[in-house]
Amino acid sequence: MKMNKILVTAAITLISLIGFSQNSVKELSEGIEKGQYGIIEVRLNMEDEFRTLEGRDSQGLARISFFTGKGDKKNLVTKGFEGFDHVVVILNDMKANGWKLISTYPIRGTSLLITHYLFEKVKK
């Protein structure tokens, strides 16, 4: 009986995690044609400015998103901030999936630091 409760709990946990999974660059790149643009947005809380190497434990408003103009609301790559090593991994993933970095620009709000990375799809 105790084993059944453990199995049910594990199954519910696994289903919950799968249901709330985030998207990969590869998944978000599907259906994007050569020559189209996409934007990676790195959004940090102002206090994350000094936590760029190690990230932080709480998620807050920090996130990394990939906008392709499809408007399907599946643009979240990661919620929270795991440090700039993770940003580099995502930028390398963009390159591996046929994207070329065109430009970057910062946006500074009262409580957020936002950096946009503009990419062009160069490979199908």
Language model features with spans:
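Terminus-proximal functional modules
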Residues: 2-8, 19-124
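Repetitive helical segments and hydrophobic/amphipathic motifs
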Residues: 13-14
